[in-house]
Amino acid sequence: MKLMLSLGSLSANSLPIEKKQQVLIDLVIRTYQSHERTELFKAITEYRKNQLIALFPEHANKSYSIIFELMDYRDLIERYPSTLSEEATLLEKVVGQCFMHWLDFWCECEIAAIKAKFPLKENELPAPQLLFEDSAYYGALVERVEDTQLMVQIPSHPQAMPLSDAITLSNLELFIQGEKWYEMLSLLSLSQVGKHFIVLKHPVQDSCPTLVASALIQNWSVRDTWLSYAPQFSNEQWNYCFPSYGYSEFTRLQLFTPSTLSKCYSLPEFDNEFKLQLSDTQAVCEVLRLTVSGNAQQKLYFLYLAQKELMSVLHQAGYKIGFTIIEQPFMLNFYRAIDAKAYFHSGYCDLNDDGKQTYRGFWNFEMMVKAFSNIDFRGYKRAVRASRKRGSLERDEHV
């Protein structure tokens, strides 16, 4: 009842949008326990997603960022009030007054909830200086982030916090707030548990290490939860493009029984054969959520450094092949400039019909380590520029 009164008062208040946003977020964080908040957000998300798909069935397979912007959110909730509860109806009404849509609000709530647990303090050491020097950083593999006692800070919030919270906050800011990958909101728990690769800046004086990059590492034993095998990423809409030398490289790596993977003609067929024939299951993993911090130039540097450290750490850990999903042109242009056997696509798809291709592919860790062994950031950027220029010339030739 107290929440209803607060929401009613806030709804009628003519506060500036930014102020109303902050008051609403604070109210929700104070009112709900973490698990209660998650259940509420998931319920309303599912309700509105199903409703929007019913209204626009031709967009059923699009991403949440497309689906939730098919209709003005305020118009949606006025024309189709929630039937979940009176509380949900009033909450959505206030959200509609100050946020683009429900998922935008969910993301901002999760970011604020973490920052509220670890508020910035006055008289703290200044924010860490992020150098463009490889030796200032180190990569590591953490088996269970939920169990580690390691406390770190991140560049956007220089306050000590558990590693799992730092990874989650970084994922929220880069992928959800920045790239609008709202599907991750209901899967935030994956950022808080399990095996993760991290890149840390060595601590200076008494400050804690700074997390500048991370990635989720999932073993073959949990392949049923892999994004690579989710229906959206393994269907007939995908263009199959696994190269002939990929089959040879897999045979050389001794991954299968029989030793040679059967020739395939579609991505779903390839996925099925891979599962049936794989015998060295310890050699395979999926790498997702490669997250980097900092401003635009720092992110490019940490993207280079994270890949360099990632390949080395996973190769040393005994992995041979890593499934991955990539949209990042900077990464793809570099891969075009190195040995083709170091990274190869298995398929590509324009998921949202917006001209942007998403690629499923494989990192061959042994070959990737070799590719990065004699290259620094300057050489990395030079290779990317040359690859981009070469690609542009090739496109011009086909016009």
UniProtKB/Swiss-Prot annotation:
Name of this protein: Acyl-homoserine-lactone synthase LuxM
GO-annotated biological processes: quorum sensing
Pfam families per UniProt: AHL_synthase
A GO molecular-function annotation: N-acyl homoserine lactone synthase activity
Domain of life: Bacteria
Record keywords: Autoinducer synthesis, Quorum sensing, S-adenosyl-L-methionine, Transferase
KW RNA-binding (keyword) present: no
Enzyme Commission code(s) on record: 2.3.1.184
Similarity comment: family membership: Belongs to the LuxM / VanM family.
Reaction equations catalysed: a fatty acyl-[ACP] + S-adenosyl-L-methionine = an N-acyl-L-homoserine lactone + S-methyl-5'-thioadenosine + holo-[ACP] + H(+)
